[in-house]
Swiss-Prot record:
Modified residues (N-acetylmethionine): M1
Primary location group: cytoplasm
Subcellular location(s) per record: Cytoplasm; Nucleus
Annotated protein name in UniProt: 26S proteasome regulatory subunit 6B homolog
Keyword terms, alphabetized: Acetylation, ATP-binding, Cytoplasm, Nucleotide-binding, Nucleus, Proteasome
Gene name, Swiss-Prot/TrEMBL: psmC4
UniProt-recorded Gene Ontology molecular function terms: ATP binding; ATP hydrolysis activity; proteasome-activating activity
Gene Ontology biological process terms, A to Z: hyperosmotic response; proteasome-mediated ubiquitin-dependent protein catabolic process
Segments crossing the lipid bilayer: none
Family per record: Belongs to the AAA ATPase family.
GO CC entries: nucleus; phagocytic vesicle; proteasome regulatory particle; proteasome regulatory particle, base subcomplex
């Protein structure tokens, strides 16, 4: 009997323990279900908030897009007042204190930075690349000039001097280090018009992997005070950022004439441009691999400070071609032309008239145009005679193209 009672008690205890476990599991399940419901509610709330925030973001993006819509005004940042306000100068010459759009990266807002201003409120709404507001154009490897040394007739001495001063320092810089000398920093090309100065500069750019920046001296003369010196700084900064590079300034006499006691604001501004150019050339680091080529037809008017060694170390003269040079130029130009066997180029080479390479090119072009006018595919001696007389304007009474 005692054993039966003990067994019954054990069964009772086991049932009670099982009941308690079921109750605990039920409580845990209810607790987890309530947490799940809470999380579901939170999820729905977060989804709702996400939709609202996304709607607000799209609205804000549309508003920023509307504010930045063109046309915009171009200006220059002078200084920052605080993180949300700055002082700018617009292209109209006005100096303004303006608000700055909150989405603009403040690291890009440096003094002299080019900025875009909203046309109604003048608020600063965007930053621009430094070269975006100027006429400076950097020619990459795929935009290089197509002219090569073989396209230039004659000028062997000029080609050699140019290669030594510009091409070799860019392609074999270590050669100058081993010899222990500094390569020339700048080259001046001077001579009469049409003698191949610009063409040789293009050929050097074609034969090197350097970036090529071409500007004309008159482009530095701007309407507003200080714009010209800033363009000079932009040219040299762009060259340093893309080194090795070649800066070619054509018609340098537009800004580099001898200084004098200027009486007008325009003359003083041109002299400030020249001083900035001198300063930029003095600040050159030889190791940067940036070469400056300048060309002019009036070397006698240039300022002596620009011509001194250390700025323009090499000066290359381009005289009018002699008889041998004229022969080579004629051969290069006519190599792709369909000439009659009767055409004797030596007759035109031996004539005493002083001709530049551009005038020889004009003679050949006029000869070809005369053949086209007569519906011929072959250029005859009389076409060359017509072209010769038309180009050098010897006989104006024969300047009748249709006879």
């Amino acid at each position: 009997m005692e054993e039966l009672g003990l067994a019954t008690a054990k069964v009772t205890v086991t049932k009670e323990a099982s009941h308690h476990r079921e109750a605990d599991l039920y409580q845990k399940m209810k607790s987890l279900e309530s947490k799940l419901d809470f999380f579901n509610i939170q999820e729905e709330y977060i989804k709702y908030e996400y939709k609202n925030l996304k709607r607000e973001l799209l609205h804000a993006q549309e508003e920023v897009k509307r504010i930045r819509s063109v046309p915009l005004l171009i200006g220059q940042l002078l200084e920052m007042v605080d993180s949300n306000t700055g002082i700018v100068q617009s292209t109209s010459g006005s100096t303004l204190c303006v608000r700055i759009l909150s989405t603009i990266d403040r690291e890009l807002l440096k003094p002299s930075a080019s900025v875009a201003l909203q046309r109604h409120s003048n608020a600063l709404v965007d930053t621009l690349p430094p070269e975006s507001d100027s006429s400076i154009h950097l020619l990459g490897a795929d935009e290089k000039p197509s002219e090569s040394y073989s396209d230039i007739g004659g000028g062997d001495i000029q080609k050699q001097e140019m290669r030594e001063a510009v091409e070799l320092p860019l392609t074999h810089h270590n050669l100058y280090k081993q010899i222990g000398i500094d390569p020339p920093r700048g080259v001046l090309l001077y001579g009469p018009p049409g003698t191949g100065k610009t063409m040789l500069a293009k050929a050097v750019a074609h034969h090197t992997s350097a970036a090529f920046i071409r500007v004309v001296g008159s482009e530095f003369v701007q309407k507003y005070l200080g714009e010209g010196p800033r363009l000079v700084r932009d040219v040299f900064r762009l060259a340093r950022e893309n080194s090795p590079a070649i800066i070619f300034i054509d018609e340098i006499d537009a800004i580099a004439t001898k200084r004098f006691d200027a009486q007008t604001g325009a003359d003083r501004e041109v002299q400030r441009i020249l001083m900035e150019l001198l300063n930029q050339m003095d600040g050159f680091d030889v190791s940067v691999n940036v070469k400056v080529i300048m060309a002019t037809n009036r070397q006698d008017t240039l300022d002596p400070a620009l011509l001194r060694p250390g700025r323009l170390d090499r000066k290359i003269e381009f005289p009018l071609p002699d008889r041998r040079q004229k022969r080579l130029i004629f051969q290069v130009i006519t190599s792709k032309m369909n000439l009659s066997d009767e055409v004797d180029l030596e007759d035109y080479v031996s004539r005493p008239d002083k001709l530049s390479g551009a005038e020889i090119q004009s003679i050949c072009q006029e000869a070809g145009m005369h053949a086209i006018r007569k519906n011929r595919y072959v250029i005859l001696p009389k076409d060359f005679e017509k072209g010769y007389k038309a180009s050098i304007k010897k006989n104006t009474h024969e300047f009748n193209f249709y006879n």
